[in-house]
């Protein structure tokens, strides 16, 4: 087709940018090529139709995207660790140095760089120190072993890139003319096996990257695993009316299945052709085309996952503001109702405040915040339990109405019931209007350029069931931006200070 078009064959057709079918003459005019149609010199026609130019050209485009998506997967794994309150030791230089694999060392170093100094990781460390038993000692595999998982895939993509780089700079026509020896060498440099094999390997690597993203995304939306984030990352006041990212997770499962299907090799399906002259042939263009399909699906997965991470970042911001509001309210109410008795004397219940605030610190905000005073939710149950425990310790004093902590429980709960819902709603309203008392921690992190790109440049926002916008509309904005290459600059900005080496072992 390309050779026919270049030589101006009247029956050759091209498709223009708008989808209109063009003749060769119209295509030349549209491309502003003012010269006549090409007159092919000896061997040039064969080079066009029988060489590896088209396959290697497609492979070059595919591998450019594959390299970008590989780096993006490393950075997204680091952001995943941030929002999941993971333990940063999984990136420790020594662990990966002892394994020797260069791809793994590189992946860990990139994640280590992103997480170094992260406000989220500092907060997570404090959380683990306060209550070491609040979450498992070790993070799950999708987080903890992400450098080991991505490492070999990076090496495969890099090897494939080098292979195609050699191919596009090589001679692949036939025969080759050795002028010095006056020989025509009938060889087979047109055989595109390096392309076919490289594309098969790349496609397998892309499928594995997609599988990791799906595993991480599934953890992110599951409130049994995500360390306090709401189920499906719902952000509405009433989570019962908000499906959140449930549809996105179903889509991710579908993407992952198709990506894994495409990982099947093409080069194992070679058929003999041309009366057994071409009894082996590379199928390089087929493999490159299928890898291009895989690239598109992985872009869909990457955009969905990054939108989920941005949602989680915003929910952590909301969580921090809501927790602060609840904590201040509980503190104020306990001071007013538990400090003194009816006659102004100091009351034994004044010692409860510290333990009451510990409950607020340890309880996941989104487990109760849609109805903070509900007796069926853990906050009120555990606050009451603190007062009951102190009352039991109070022993003999409980017999005196003036020193009884049991007598204070109803007063404390009634005042909290009056004030807490109003304070929570006020905090949420301030957050939604962009006037949150506590700023978003992401601005202090190296992953901020990606978040800023998604939220500010693309104009996306926190997804809630209260809005008319569907999640798919927001995902499409990011997917389109990734396809247009707009994500490259913010991605590289995240790594702008990285010198290509792991942090020193201290």
UniProtKB/Swiss-Prot annotation:
One Pfam family matching this protein: Lyase_aromatic
Gene Ontology terms: biological process: cinnamic acid biosynthetic process; L-phenylalanine catabolic process
Pathway: Phenylpropanoid metabolism; trans-cinnamate biosynthesis; trans-cinnamate from L-phenylalanine: step 1/1
EC assignment: 4.3.1.24
Alphabetized Gene3D superfamilies for the sequence: Fumarase/aspartase (Central domain), Fumarase/aspartase (N-terminal domain), Phenylalanine ammonia-lyase 1, domain 3
InterPro entries, per database record: Aromatic_Lyase, Fumarase/histidase_N, L-Aspartase-like, Phe_NH3-lyase, Phe_NH3-lyase_shielding_dom_sf
Subcellular location: Cytoplasm
Cellular component terms per the entry's GO annotation: cytoplasm
Keywords associated with the record: Cytoplasm, Lyase, Phenylalanine catabolism, Phenylpropanoid metabolism
Post-translational modification: Contains an active site 4-methylidene-imidazol-5-one (MIO), which is formed autocatalytically by cyclization and dehydration of residues Ala-Ser-Gly.
Catalysed reactions, semicolon-separated: L-phenylalanine = (E)-cinnamate + NH4(+)
Molecular functions (GO terms): phenylalanine ammonia-lyase activity
Binding site for (E)-cinnamate: 50, 138, 144, 174, 246, 274, 277
Major site of localization recorded for this protein: cytoplasm
SUBUNIT field: Homotetramer.
Family: Belongs to the PAL/histidase family.
Classification via PANTHER family: HISTIDINE AMMONIA-LYASE
Function recorded in the entry: This is a key enzyme of plant metabolism catalyzing the first reaction in the biosynthesis from L-phenylalanine of a wide variety of natural products based on the phenylpropane skeleton.
Name the record gives this protein: Phenylalanine ammonia-lyase class 1
Organism: Phaseolus vulgaris (Kidney bean)
